[in-house]
């Protein structure tokens, strides 16, 4: 394999599947969410996370990749845990958001947790998530 190209790609690559980059990204599947048709990959060279999803069009579905930048020391499992906490808080307020917005909120909360010296445990994340969602008036 040649040097990976993760840093040369934009944050969103529309119309491309991760398999189109075989030999250019040393990807490894780390999670698959069948109800959402979303797969999470990690580049084994540079440790960049990629989310592959499909957007419905009038003539089928178009794949797209989204680069996920995690806060320092965070794992994909931490992100998933934080998304669950954020979704639980929003569900308790009868607020529904899509997966991308939930992920964005979770990444914001994780960034705050890291900046304040916290970790990514469920209790800490829940505390920061409640505070952050109040600040942004959700």
Model-derived features with residue positions:
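Short, compact, well-ordered microdomains
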Residues: 41-72
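Short metal-coordination and nucleic-acid-contact micro-motifs, chiefly zinc-binding Cys/His arrays
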Residues: 2, 36-39
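Amphipathic alpha-helical segments in structured regions that serve as interaction surfaces
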Residues: 78-93, 99-138
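Short loop/turn motifs at secondary-structure junctions and domain boundaries
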Residues: 32-34
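Short, non-ligating residues that shape and space the ligands of small metal-coordination modules
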Residues: 12-15, 52-53
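Short cysteine-rich clusters marking metal-coordination/redox-active sites
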Residues: 3-4, 43
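Cys/His-rich microdomains that often coordinate metals
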Residues: 8-10, 49-50
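Short Cys/His-rich Zn2+-coordinating modules
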Residues: 21-30
